[in-house]
Amino acid sequence: ESEKMVSEKHTQGRVNFWGYMYGYYFAPKRSYCATDDPEKEFKTFIKKLHQAGIACIMEMYFPRECNPVTTLRALQFWKLYYHVDGFHVLGEGVSAKLLMHDGVLSDTRLMFHDFDESQIRKKKKPEDKCIAQYNPGFLQDMRRFLKSDEDMVSAAAYHIRRNPNIYAVINYMACQDGFTMNDMVTYNYRHNEANQENNQDGSSYNYSWNCGVEGASADPEVEGLRRRLVKNAFATLLCSRGPAMFFAGDEFCNTQFGNNNAYCQDNIISWLDWNRLDEYKEIHDFVRFMIHFR
C-alpha cells in the first residue's frame, strides 16, 4: 500500500463532501452561500479577508482528464475575477511549469506537492517567493520524532531548519487527508467503518501513538500525556522555519473519532465541534501563545 495521502475519491453513491471531482471550475458553490448571489457573496468575502489582512488560498483539484490549459485558465479566472491570492493545486491535470511561468500568475502563491526546482522563476528577494511545496515529509518525520521513534533527531533537525531561498515549504502535522492532531495521539489504527468500505480506505501509515489506550480515555494520566504531545506538536510546528499550516479544529483538539479519510462524512465525524473549545481552552491558549511567539 502506498504511503501517499489519497487525493482522488470515489464516493460510490455516498456524498462527495470534499468535492474532489472533474469540472465546475469557474463557479462558486452555491450551497456554501447564505444568499442567492454566490458571485457577489464570494467577492465580498475576499474583500473582507483582505481588509483583515488575511490572504485567501483556494484548493483546486484537476484530474488526469483535465487539459492543463483549462487548469491555467481556471486559476487566472479566480485571480482576476475574484482576487484570490493563491492556489493549492492537486491532481495529474496540473502542469507546474505552465502555471509557474504564466505572467498573470507571476505574483500568485502557488502550492504544489511536487515540482522541478529548476523551473521556478527566481525572485529578486527571497521574501518575494511565491512558489511552495506541500511537505508531507514534515508530517511523517515529525510525528515519528514526537512519539520517540529511533533515529529521528537528524530528520527533525532538517525539517525544523529547512527554508529554501527560491521556494517555501509548507510544514504541517495534520490536514484533511489523515488523522487530526488529536487523533494522532489517540488512535494507533484508522477507524473508517462509517465509510462503508470495510475499513480498507485511507492510509495505513499514520505515524500515530494512542498513549496506551485506543480511543477516548477517562484516565487523567493518558489525557494529560495526550495534551502534552499536542502542545509539543504545535511548538515544533510553529518553531520551524518554513510556513506553518494546521488543520482547522486542531487548536482545540477536534476529533474525527479515528476516521482518517472523512471524504464522505457530512456529519459529526468531520464537522468542527466548537464545544471542545471550552474543554480544551488550555490547548487553544497555548496555540495562540506560540503564534504570538513566532
Model-inferred region functions:
Residues 1, 25, 59:
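Conserved hydrophobic/aromatic pocket- or pore-lining residues that grip, position, or stack substrates
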Residues 45-56, 81-83, 236-243, 289, ...:
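A structural motif corresponding to the C-terminal end of an alpha-helix
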Residues 96-248, 252, 261-265:
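Conserved alpha/beta catalytic core and glycan-binding cleft of carbohydrate-active enzymes
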Residues 40-41, 48-124:
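Active-site neighborhood of glycoside hydrolase catalytic domains
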Residues 5-51, 64-81, 194-215, 266-269:
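Aromatic- and acidic-residue-enriched carbohydrate-binding clefts of CAZyme catalytic domains
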Residues 278-294:
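Catalytic cores of secreted or luminal carbohydrate-active enzymes
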Residues 274-276:
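Long, K/E/R/D-enriched contiguous segments that form extended
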Residues 255:
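Core nucleic-acid recognition elements
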